[in-house]
Amino acid sequence: MLFKSIGELIPLYALYALLFADHGMSTGQISLLFAIWSATSFLLEVPSGAWADTVSRRGLLALSGVLLTAGFALWTAVPSFAGFAAGFVLWGTSGSLASGTFEALLYDDLAARGESGSYPRVLGYTRAGAEAAVVVAIVAATPLYLYGGYALVGWSSVVIAGAHTLVALSLPTAPKAVSAVDVDDLEDSASEAIAPESVVARPRPFARYLTMLKTGVGEAIRVRAVRYGVLLEALLFGITAFDEYFALLAEESGVSTAVVPLLVGLTVLGSLTGSVLAGRTEGMSGRTMAIAVGGAGVLFLGGAVIAGLATGRPDAVYLLTGVGFGSIGVSYGIVYNAGIVAGARLQDAIEGPARATVTSVSGLLGEVIALAVFGFAALVTLWWSMSTLLALLGASILAIAALTPRWLPRSAEP
């Protein structure tokens, strides 16, 4: 929990959209920066997952922290489009190395202790700790900005990211959770892959990497429960790319800059609540999840519309934005909770040894959806407001709800 929490205790998280805007970036340019970030993750998602099934997962998490630290340092030292873009490439690479790696490491550690059934609850608490850290970071961002501007916010973020890297080195290691049958299957496929080495030598780590990549992607495509689980988790987490526009919605509504982090904080409290409740909702049926996600779509759409009504109404701006962001926060919490449950069900459905690779396939598809969100945002905001954009994205949650009953993997037997 400490590792994930410190990784989210970054003051820049509350202000980077405004940082870009205050340095002359248009909404289209900001969306392009987000797309660069997502595209980097997209290109590296599955290969990094296969790497995590081959080499030290703890080492990859430490490397991820180093890249994250470098990215924030670049943003602070070179606040321009080029600097922001390069920082996002580093951050995207960092995220790809960590995506699936931490979850697989956690699951394997619990499996080694005979407590794999606790995975949904532990993962929920871990993410709740991370969301709580975001709340603290949001609260800290305002005084840091008032005292030292974006420079102090940026360098504070660099220091915290460095501490996150050091914590990664203290994480436990555990044997990968593989059954005897899976080991035999892996050895057979590895033998076929390595056989040609009598003619052309190939480094063993690379052969293992290819084997894990093939095994993980193959399971994600071939096994129905895994395939649907991958798709559902990707949809639920990919659609949350809309959170990158919350600060811009608040700014468009007409509130003061000092209030923007507080409104964004309402949405973070929503996701925090969703994380905490994941242990209680882990056994929900697909039908129940569909109803919850459908309700979240209605709340999100309504909240975006209400916040949009605040524009040009200084007498009611804080009332309308408070109600609007409160509704969005509740919706965000429901969607976030559903994403955690779907991710836990996916982990239970995975039977092969390439757990991190399969998880990364879901992450890859999530990045594809995020890219679609960013592209959609860049186009929509050419003609319509930010509130209209978010209302349309809220409507898409309703479509996800319709798919949930069929795609949610069954709960593992107790």
Residues of each region from the PLM?
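A single, central transmembrane helix in multi-pass transporters
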Residues: 13, 19, 218-273
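Helix-loop junctions on the cytosolic side of multi-pass membrane transporters
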Residues: 109, 157-187, 200, 406-414
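Juxtamembrane intracellular "pre-TM" segments in multi-pass secondary transporters
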Residues: 171-231
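C-terminal transmembrane bundle of multi-pass solute transporters/carriers
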Residues: 31-33, 42-50, 57-61, 253-414
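Transmembrane alpha-helix termini and helix-breaking/packing motifs in multi-pass membrane transporters
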Residues: 22, 134-157, 251-253, 370-393
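Hydrophobic core of transmembrane alpha-helices in multi-pass small-molecule transporters
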Residues: 5, 71, 82-98, 234, ...
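Helix-breaking motifs and short loop linkers at transmembrane-helix boundaries and internal kinks
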Residues: 24, 56, 77-82, 306-310
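Cytoplasmic helix-loop-helix junction between adjacent transmembrane helices
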Residues: 88-131
